[in-house]
Amino acid sequence: MANWMIKGANLLRPIYEEMRKELVSKQFLHADETPLEVLNEPGKAPASKSYMWVYKTGQFEGNPIVLYDYEVGISGEFAKKFLSGFSGYLHCDSWAGYDKVENARRCGCWAHLRRYFLNALDVQEDKTDYSTIAGQGFLMIEKVFSLEKTPGKKSEYTLDEIAEIRKEKSAQAVQEFFKFCEENQGRTLPKSLTG
């Protein structure tokens, strides 16, 4: 059955390539990668990790495009090659490999950032103690998330209108969060979950 999948993928490769060209022509993209184990992969130990990369157009880019790219490892070179020709905003996590994507302006992912604070809360003795740095940071990000839901459905507003709403409502919460991080930077260990 795996051979059928491989043959089918090869037949669809020209369509996939056209979709990739369309994807990299957009102004806003999302990218992420996740490890997976493939049994009996040629040239690799059985327990070694490979990666599935996902690339998606932004929510205001018209017809959505989501493409997956399987690679044998994790390297910024894979993202650089896949996103060749892209020059826009790349919404991704803080992994340094995405720095290799030329002409991309990186935008940090608040969901990934939120996860660090949530993980730090999970290892606290009292997981509901929001007076800690982890708890306060988590609540501040939750506030940003709740304000970001305010604009409503994408069809209701233009990008300029959403930017204006963000200036009015979200900007102050974001500034407060970054100020909180700067003020507490010396109170956390660099290798800790909130460092």
Residue spans for each PLM region:
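Catalytic center-proximal scaffold of phosphoryl-transfer enzymes
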Residues: M1-G195
